[in-house]
């Protein structure tokens, strides 16, 4: 499967997404390029598959009005902070207490990478079982994660305060991050961490649409460094954007993202909670994979799922997967383990069920394609249940 980047026209016009180069670094295989629709305020983004020129993209609509700030031109990103309810044009990308003199402190962090490009991430299912299969500490770990998830959650409704990006643009970005994860065989936890970093950053900072992919790429770069045994090189992440951004820009954005997040990288995710629940629930591999599929679908929609804590979204994914395959919603042992009753989970469960029903008709299909494979028991091919036996 070929990965795709957001490749704008020469002159860095803002809001186009196209597939990455077919030639170049070893990690990506030659193949068809995918040209996506223009990132505008419209909600419709249609895929067009086919061979196209490496520099061809559709025409932009009023792209000259997008770069409204020049104060941070050396970084190549235009951000205003803090985000306020009344959207204003970005004038700088400064933190509230000080100027980010990134030019003075940026280092070439990619030159010393330990990535062995011939090796891929270790099998994550076995790794998670080894890490989490500690019954004597399971409750303590869960209690600690429940405390941390409140601290490291994005702000609900943050997208309404973004003056230049929309929910649809974020959906396209997350869909692309899924493809990047598959191309480089990244762990599922890496994807969940990257989306957490992205949402927390956007909760605090306002970003122009043409730089949204730069933030997303920096987020997955950081998540890979944190989670992977052999993270891809920085040059690989530059490449997957079709060289839309330079290595220097990516490293500067990485540093900016770290500062905004106060270097708090250990954030509980839906994936972590779900792995705990599946170990406690003793369900079959197919049910586990369906729950993973549903939890990844929840990453696409910032609303409504950002309003739910990761532990609750994980519980909803478990319930829906368990009922779809086994006819049972929420077992008593997980109620005792989590403290969540079914009544508490129902609002999130209903939203997730609605998302599952419409998944096949979405323009973004990276998650569906991922879970069609035998590795995941083909769970995205399963028909969703029409209704749930909710009180």
Curated annotation (Swiss-Prot):
Q: Where in the cell is it found?
A: Nucleus
Specify whether Cell division is a keyword of the entry: yes
The question of whether Transit peptide is a record keyword is answered with: no
Q: Name one GO cellular component term.
A: nucleus
What keywords tag this UniProt record? Cell cycle, Cell division, Cyclin, Mitosis, Nucleus
Q: Which InterPro entries match?
A: Cyclin (IPR039361), Cyclin-like_dom (IPR013763), Cyclin-like_sf (IPR036915), Cyclin_C-dom (IPR004367), Cyclin_N (IPR006671), Cyclins_cyclin-box (IPR048258)
Q: GO terms for biological process?
A: cell division
Q: Describe the protein's quaternary organization and the partners it interacts with.
A: Interacts with the CDK1 and the CDK2 protein kinases to form a serine/threonine kinase holoenzyme complex. The cyclin subunit imparts substrate specificity to the complex.
Q: Which protein family is named in the record?
A: Belongs to the cyclin family. Cyclin AB subfamily.
This chain's function reads: May be involved in the control of the cell cycle at the G1/S (start) and G2/M (mitosis) transitions.
| Protein name per the record | Cyclin-A1
Per the UniProt record, the source organism is Carassius auratus (Goldfish)
Q: Which gene encodes it?
A: ccna1
């Amino acid at each position: 499967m070929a990965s795709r980047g957001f490749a704008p026209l020469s002159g860095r016009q803002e809001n186009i997404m196209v597939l990455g180069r077919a030639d170049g670094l070893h990690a990506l295989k030659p193949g068809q390029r995918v040209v996506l629709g223009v990132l505008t305020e419209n909600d419709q983004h249609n895929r067009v598959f086919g061979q196209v020129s490496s520099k061809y993209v559709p025409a932009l609509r009023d792209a000259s009005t997008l770069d409204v700030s020049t104060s941070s031109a050396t970084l190549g990103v235009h951000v205003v902070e803090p985000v306020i309810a009344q959207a204003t044009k970005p004038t700088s990308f400064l933190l509230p207490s000080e100027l980010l003199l990134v030019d003075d402190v940026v280092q070439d962090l990619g030159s010393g990478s330990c990535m062995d490009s011939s090796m891929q991430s270790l099998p994550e299912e076995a790794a998670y079982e080894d890490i989490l299969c500690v019954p004597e500490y399971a409750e303590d770990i869960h209690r600690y994660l429940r405390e941390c998830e409140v601290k490291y959650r994005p702000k609900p409704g943050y997208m309404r305060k973004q003056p230049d990006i929309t929910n649809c643009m974020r959906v396209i970005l997350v869909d692309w991050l899924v493809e990047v994860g598959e191309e480089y065989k990244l762990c599922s936890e890496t994807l969940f961490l990257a989306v957490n970093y992205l949402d927390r950053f956007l909760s605090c900072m306002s970003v122009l649409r043409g730089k949204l992919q730069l933030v997303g790429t920096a987020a997955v770069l950081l998540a890979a460094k944190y989670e992977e045994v052999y993270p891809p090189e920085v040059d690989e992440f530059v490449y997957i954007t079709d060289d839309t951004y330079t290595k220097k820009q990516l490293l500067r954005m990485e540093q900016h993202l770290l500062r905004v997040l106060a270097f708090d990288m250990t954030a509980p995710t839906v994936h972590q909670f779900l792995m705990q629940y599946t170990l406690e629930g003793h369900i079959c591999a197919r049910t586990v994979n369906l729950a993973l599929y549903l939890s990844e679908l929840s990453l696409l929609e910032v609303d409504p799922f950002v309003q739910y804590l990761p532990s609750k979204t994980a519980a909803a994914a478990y319930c829906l997967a368990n009922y779809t395959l086994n006819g049972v919603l929420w077992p008593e042992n997980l109620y005792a383990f989590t403290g969540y009753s079914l009544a508490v989970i129902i609002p999130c469960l209903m939203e997730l069920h609605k998302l599952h029903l419409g998944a096949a008709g979405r323009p973004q299909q990276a998650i569906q394609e991922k879970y069609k494979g035998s590795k995941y028991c083909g769970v995205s091919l399963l028909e969703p249940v029409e209704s749930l036996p909710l009180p």
